[in-house]
Amino acid sequence: MSEAANWQPSAPISNLLKRADMIKKIRQFFTDRGVLEVDTPCMSQATVTDVHLSTFETRFLAPTMAKSLSLYMTTSPEYHMKRLLAAGSGPIYQMGRCFRNEEMGRYHNPEFTLLEWYRPHYDMYRLMDEVDDLLQQILTCHSAETLSYQQAFLRHLNIDPLSADETQIKEAAVRLNLASITDNEKDRDTFLQLLFMAGVEPYIGRDKPVFIYHFPASQAALASISTEDYRVAERFEVYFKGIELANGFYELTDSAEQQQRFEQDNRQRAALGLPKRSIDERFIAALKHGLPPCSGVALGIDRLVMLSVNAENLSEVMAFPVERA
């Protein structure tokens, strides 16, 4: 199809109307709970160090500038929102565009809408309850099931992801017809992620949402490590009808630990032949100033709309995905 022929939106207008109504209801949900809506930049002078995320980069050069400035499209508003929390904002949320220079397909578009919110003095479980409330209100679904990462692996793969040795993990991969990766892949977390995607995800959250919590500590990202079990992180994800909807943390507030994790990311990037990323010093400074104990979560709006209208592809709920942008 020529570019001129696909000028129309890929989503039916009826779905776009439902999308607008959903966004209105989400805003009302947070207004009723006294959570402040904020607006942070789509471009930043620093980006994420996460080896699994690829960013869009551009350069800014004003006539008055002697040197251009590198800017990155944000993959999430997390760092900016935590700077607001450290400045005393109280509970906050944001719905905005984020960008990832990665895959495109049924559930992915390089530009997407993310709902992210933070609750000072909430632990992970209290925030999970609030996410559950939102999903029930927006999707008219049943209350969610909760299942630890360990329980999910034991139930569906019959292995303990926290104690399984390399042989057990590779045997599980063979049972899932993933044998082709066993000889080349050495990273334990990559193995576990592949096993989760192939052997757990297809079987959870079919009739109601499910929260998977307490991911391995090595997959903590920006979450705190559990004080009750050092092997796991205070992190959760939400799945419903085969779709990953949300990713939440009881947030890491220790600036030194966060600095170490960023540096470890960069060492891993170097080992994988990926470019090193500069560490967001403003974010680290905010943590040093003092981030209140809090939990936060990011939820994909486009995927939420998909579930609401029973769509099979993001293109059915986005006016102009990248193919028509």
Swiss-Prot record:
Q: Which domain of life is it from?
A: Bacteria
User: What is any one of the record's Gene Ontology cellular component terms?
Assistant: cytosol
Which of this chain's residues are annotated to bind substrate? 76-78, 118, 251
| Pfam families in the cross-refs | tRNA-synt_2
**One record GO biological process:** lysyl-tRNA aminoacylation
Key words, A-Z: ATP-binding, Ligase, Nucleotide-binding
EC numbers for this chain = 6.3.2.-
Q: Which residues bind ATP?
A: 100-102, 109, 244-245, 300
- Molecular function (GO) terms listed? acid-ammonia (or amide) ligase activity; ATP binding; lysine-tRNA ligase activity; tRNA binding
Instruction: Note the HAMAP family from the entry.
Output: EF_P_modif_A
Q: What does this protein do?
A: With EpmB is involved in the beta-lysylation step of the post-translational modification of translation elongation factor P (EF-P). Catalyzes the ATP-dependent activation of (R)-beta-lysine produced by EpmB, forming a lysyl-adenylate, from which the beta-lysyl moiety is then transferred to the epsilon-amino group of a conserved specific lysine residue in EF-P.
Q: Which family does it belong to?
A: Belongs to the class-II aminoacyl-tRNA synthetase family. EpmA subfamily.
**Name of the molecule in the record:** Elongation factor P--(R)-beta-lysine ligase
Question: Which taxonomic lineage does the organism of this UniProt entry have?
Answer: Bacteria, Pseudomonadati, Pseudomonadota, Gammaproteobacteria, Enterobacterales
Per the record, the gene is epmA
